[in-house]
Every structure is written in C-alpha cells, then in structure tokens.
C-alpha cells in the first residue's frame, strides 16, 4: 500500500496515553510505589530511540500528589519529536509533523514493551486502567 501524505495536513499532534492504577496511601493520596525505579530502567531501555532525557519542573511535586502528572520526557534530541513522557501512573507517546500511523504504532509498541520490561514485577504488576489515542487537529480560518 502506498503511503499518502497530505500537503497541508491539519494534524497538530498525535498522542497515545496509557495509565495504570496507583496505590492508595492515605485519603486523597495515591502513589506509584515503583515509579522512581521505573524511571531509570525505562531510560535505559529507551536510549537507542530517545537518548535525550529531560526532567521536567513537575518532577519536584511530592509523590503523594503527583499521580498522572508527566515528570520526564525522552526525545531523539533536544526539542525533537517524537517523544515519550513518563510520570507516576502514566506514559505517553507523542508525535507531530513527522506522524505516520505505521511509525507511530511501532513507537507505541516499543514504548509499552519497555515499560512492561522495566517496571518492577512487569506487566502483571501494572493494572492498566485507561488507554487513549488522541489526535489534535487545527484548521486555519480566514475571518
């Protein structure tokens, strides 16, 4: 099948997001008990595809209130796309202008494989509770 690329495609960003259950430690407080171990181990596994690691300012948020907040970003190079984002209970794969479904699907598959490999206890320790594929489009209007 021939890949057709639109000249002026409206896609701004494609986002794959996977969330898993957090552990309740107190009323209103949930944590990912293996998050800090997983960050380093996922970084190791993503190095080939995403060697540039950014720790985001949100990484300073206390663990008890940081659930589902992205704290680390892995890129091919500074400011480059696609990218992978990670936080307690959440991992995303994002792409923009270079988006093609076949490539994006492979990136998702490799990223999820890295997560399941890196997370202490593996796939059985993660209780996936949400998987989302989202597209953000923009169309210019002359008003």
Describe the residue ranges of each PLM region:
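Conserved aromatic-histidine-acidic binding/catalytic patches
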Residues: 4, 96-103
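N-terminal low-complexity, intrinsically disordered segments
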Residues: 1-86
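Intrinsically disordered, low-complexity acidic/polar segments
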Residues: 25-27, 102, 142
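Secondary-structure boundary elements
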Residues: 102, 106-127
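Beta-strand elements of well-folded, non-transmembrane domains
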Residues: 20-24, 97, 137-139
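Short, surface-exposed linear patches
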Residues: 38-40, 97, 114-117
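Glycine-rich, often proline-containing surface loops adjacent to acidic residues and nearby aromatics
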Residues: 10-17, 81-99, 127-134
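Aromatic/basic-lined ligand-recognition segments
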Residues: 1-3, 71-75, 127-143
């Amino acid at each position: 099948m021939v890949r057709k690329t639109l000249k002026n495609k409206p896609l701004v960003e494609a986002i794959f997001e996977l969330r898993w259950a957090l552990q309740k430690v107190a009323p209103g407080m949930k944590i990912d008990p293996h998050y800090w171990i997983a960050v380093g181990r996922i970084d190791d596994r993503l190095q080939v595809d995403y060697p540039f690691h950014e720790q985001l300012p949100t990484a300073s948020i206390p663990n008890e209130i940081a659930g589902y907040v992205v704290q680390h970003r892995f890129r091919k190079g500074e400011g480059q796309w696609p990218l992978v984002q990670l936080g307690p209970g959440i991992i995303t794969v994002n792409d923009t202008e270079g988006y093609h479904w076949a490539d994006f699907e492979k990136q998702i598959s490799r990223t999820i494989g890295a997560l399941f490999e890196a997370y202490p206890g593996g796939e059985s320790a993660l209780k996936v509770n949400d998987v989302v594929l989202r597209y953000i489009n923009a169309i210019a209007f002359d008003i």
